[in-house]
Amino acid sequence: MFDKILIANRGEIALRVLRACKELGIATVAVHSTADADAMHVRLADESVCIGPPASKDSYLNVPALLAACEITGADAVHPGYGFLSENARFAEILADHNLHFIGPKAEHIRLMGDKIEAKKTAKRLGIPVVPGSDGGVGPGDDAMGIANEIGFPVLVKAAAGGGGRGMKVAHTPDDLALALSTASNEAKSAFGDASVYLEKYLQKPGHIEIQVLGDGRGGAIHLGERDCSLQRRHQKVWEEGPSPALDAASRKKIGTTVAKAMQELKYLGVGTIEFLYEDGEFYFIEMNTRIQVEHPVTEMITDIDLVLEQIRIAAGGDLPATQEEIVINGHSIECRINAENPVSFRPSPGKIQQFHAPGGLGVRIDSAVYQGYVIPPYYDSLVGKLIVHGKTRAECLMRLRRALDEMVVEGIETTLPLFRALVREPAIIDGDYHIHWLEQYLAGQTA
């Protein structure tokens, strides 16, 4: 097992990793920018190191500063959390070059899944169903129109190096294709430094379903059920739940088995999530995230497995915590991402939290690093915290969520709490009858 882990992140995920380390008896090092000097994970860690000014590129993305922090403190492993350097294959390789353990997958798998075109080819080879589309990048010399006609309009133009909804454009008709290609390519170039794009069939009203996996890197891999992340705004997840209200037991078992088998063949190491669009009973691979996800608590609540703790244990050479047969999905869980944003315009609302009360009771969990008097800095994402609830049934879970949302107090800044209080009372949400465009259509109706 590792002796000391440096947590190369901030906010709630840094605190989440710190908790797992403490339960394993591992010493912790928090790193922070000057803007995060008063952060909760900095207060609770055994040691802390300031790694630079507020801007992420000068602090949390500053690899030399992180290496120096490891050397100063004697850390033997680095946990990257999510975001920042968590899916940076070069960072994993640099750590290995310095005899440091990267708590995550092998660098080759991070690189493979980071290239969306190669990821899709690999998924197809491993027997994972994929969205019909171009076999690779579509360049100026390719017959984009011919490919699009073969797929069938509408088509989606996507950045090969994309993520977070950037570099994605829909061409509803042949007339839209040229503009969609140039716009997506330009966006991709400015956001990711890579202008290459590819084409996929555009599904009209799909759900977004992802499968959580855990691999030991030696050919052992299991799946821990699915999460439904269909409630999204601008391709950003807002609400996640598991099991998915859209799936039946047979579909769940079939896709889970397919994915686990693929991860065994890949010899995947650690936690990972395979994301799918789901429409008319069919799954279509979108991408694989080779890190812990923001919404991992949903799976923890319904499987009773500590994913971050197991991620650390497996990175240190440990075995899988259970066989596939021992994994039992218990009850239902929902997570709401509460952001420091105006609930109507979604403008960021950084500032000082004057009052803070976290809801409690059976089956209620808050993953947050904020406290009364804490100042949310304007430099990073606007997550205040994640409210996660569990119930024996989805109906019980919704009632518990409604109660917890009404109980939660965050004053001094604007938050998206009012949005969730409204959503949890919406008939479509109560019925579990929603798709990835539902929330944006709902919001458009509210402001009309």
Task: Show where each model-derived region lies.
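ATP-binding N-terminal substructure of ATP-dependent carboxylate-amine bond-forming enzymes
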Residues: M1-L126, V138-G146, L179, E396
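ATP-dependent carboxylate activation and anion-phosphoryl transfer catalytic cores
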Residues: L6-I26, S48, E71-T73, A89, ...
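Conserved beta3 strand of the protein kinase N-lobe
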Residues: G133-S134
